[in-house]
Amino acid sequence: MKIILVVFVLIFVGVIGFNMIKGVMISRAIAGMPESSSPVTALEVQPREWTPVINTTGLVRPNQGAMLSTQNAGAVSQVLVQNGQNVKKGEVLVELDSSVERANLQAAQAQLSALRQTYQRYVGLLNSNAVSRQEMDNAKAAYDAQVASIESLKAAIERRKIVAPFDGKAGIVKINVGQYVNVGTEIVRVEDTSSMKVDFALSQNDLDKLHIGQRVTATTDARLGETFSARITAIEPAINSSTGLVDVQATFDPEDGHKLLSGMFSRLRIALPTETNQVVVPQVAISYNMYGEIAYLLEPLSEEEKGKMSGNEKLDRLYRAKQITVFTKDRQGVYAQLQGNEVKVGDKIITGGQQGIGNGSLVEWIKKDIVGAIEPAHKTPL
């Protein structure tokens, strides 16, 4: 029994010893092998200009626009406007039946002549004391009341006409001749598109960055690939107490405004003063970990490392990856503007292949076009 136990102990010790010797030999073999490198792409950071922008959304509106509706109930007697017709201020577009009002006006005008003659006769008789002043005043009051009644009837007739409030373009007429309409019935929309505008709202924190005449660039889903230029023409002098935002209006350049329709949703970019000598890198150069944003720089090999790799044909392309923490100030398209001194002009920043490396990794700089560092030639809806 003791012999068997001794044999098992010897076998166990032998296995442990063999594995230890094997591990040492493998470690020596690995240590003697040249360090492998990971391929990466990179670019040298150059000073660039950067134009910060404020991104927001807005709604396009005309210079003037109104949905015309009736002030009185009645039957439509005439429709004088066509769908899409250009109209002038004061032009009659639709007229309601006013035959009763016109008949009343004729009767009132006929009575006015008799009342005028009575009043004039009483004025002459007053001088000869044939009538009292009270009788003359009553005659004058009757005459004045009739004049006012006539003016009221004329106004009532005019209110039965729907006229263009300004020069513009009519939309789709919503009523027909003979149709009975009630007060407030929508008739037709008229819009003055001579100067198209866009209304939007911004945080009050951006108020100091705005000024009249500031350039605004707009895009719409209805016209993909096109941009429309405008300038800020009005800034609300008070903050909206319910939203905490300030209302702003911009006016489109004439050549761009006629391409837009009222009510269009638009995405806006408000250009701020250009900043020079900025550190700008492709966004693909920035990675993320649990502590925030990171990037990798190419660090030259030490002289000692170069000596050990003197026989490597890739030596002039080999670097050490240095992991740094970066802080993004702004992003536009495929580029990011960095703040702080972690990345300086002249540094070589890795733009591809970061997934397989860590701080201090040996990397090979593959000089080729960088995917994700160039804006696409044509934008798509996606």
Swiss-Prot record:
This is Uncharacterized protein HI_0894. Gene3D superfamilies: 2.40.30.170, 2.40.420.20, 2.40.50.100, Helix hairpin bin. The chain crosses the membrane at residues 1-21. SUPFAM superfamilies: HlyD-like secretion proteins. Keywords: Membrane, Transmembrane, Transmembrane helix. InterPro entries: CusB_D23, RND_pump_MFP. Its main location: membrane. Signal peptide: none annotated. It is a single-pass membrane protein. GO terms for cellular component: efflux pump complex. It comes from Haemophilus influenzae (strain ATCC 51907 / DSM 11121 / KW20 / Rd). Belongs to the membrane fusion protein (MFP) (TC 8.A.1) family.
